């Protein structure tokens, strides 16, 4: 299994357990879904189950979460257009600097494709939710979430040059 980590923070962001689709040679999209998870452990210290509250047998202690957000402990964050532009300029500059060291021939392709993709994001800015990795590093990748055309299926967007893969 391949685990994809943020090149800046080292946070685990996604794995190949999710079907990653490369888009415009700049990002990966991963479909995800809403799932119900049980909070805490299933602890029963009572000797007589009939003496326990009937309510405990209900869906108490469960919550519906995005499976990718939950699995990789991503945290929601928020941006307005102006603050996102400020963030993305700094982020792209950091990724470009890393590429110049590790893969200089990729830099022109990255710049061209990144500009085009950021324009797409800004054109539909209100449709996106934003998430950051577990370390909450403000300089690291902000993962985008949107919904497919069906309005039901969520998908996450990761800048491919901001990820490093590791066999797990």
Curated annotation (Swiss-Prot):
- Gene Ontology molecular function: calcium ion binding; guanyl nucleotide exchange factor inhibitor activity
Q: Which InterPro entries match?
A: Mss4-like_sf, Mss4/transl-control_tumour, TCTP, Translation_control_tumour_CS, Translational_control_tumour_p
Signal peptide feature range: none
Q: Which residues form the TCTP domain?
A: 1-168
Give the location in the cell: Cytoplasm
**Where does this chain mainly localize?**
cytoplasm
Q: What does this protein do?
A: Involved in calcium binding and microtubule stabilization. May be a guanine nucleotide-free chaperone (GFC).
The family assignment reads: Belongs to the TCTP family.
Name of this chain's protein: Translationally-controlled tumor protein homolog
**Organism, per UniProt?**
Schizosaccharomyces pombe (strain 972 / ATCC 24843) (Fission yeast)
């Amino acid at each position: 299994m391949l685990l994809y980590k943020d090149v800046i923070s080292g946070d685990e962001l996604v794995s190949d357990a999710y079907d990653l689709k490369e888009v415009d040679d700049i990002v990966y999209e991963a479909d995800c879904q809403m799932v119900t998870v049980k909070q805490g452990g299933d602890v029963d210290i009572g000797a007589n189950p009939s003496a326990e509250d009937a309510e405990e047998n209900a869906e108490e202690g469960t919550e519906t979460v995005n499976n990718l957000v939950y699995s990789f402990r991503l945290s929601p964050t928020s941006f307005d257009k102006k603050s996102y532009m400020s963030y993305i300029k700094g982020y792209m500059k950091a990724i470009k600097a890393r590429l110049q060291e590790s893969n200089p021939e990729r830099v022109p392709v990255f710049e061209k494709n990144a500009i085009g993709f950021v324009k797409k994001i800004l054109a539909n800015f209100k449709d996106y939710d934003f998430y950051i990795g577990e370390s909450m590093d403000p300089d690291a990748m902000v993962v985008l979430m949107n919904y497919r055309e069906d309005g039901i299926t969520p998908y996450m967007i990761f800048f491919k040059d901001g990820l490093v893969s590791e066999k797990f």
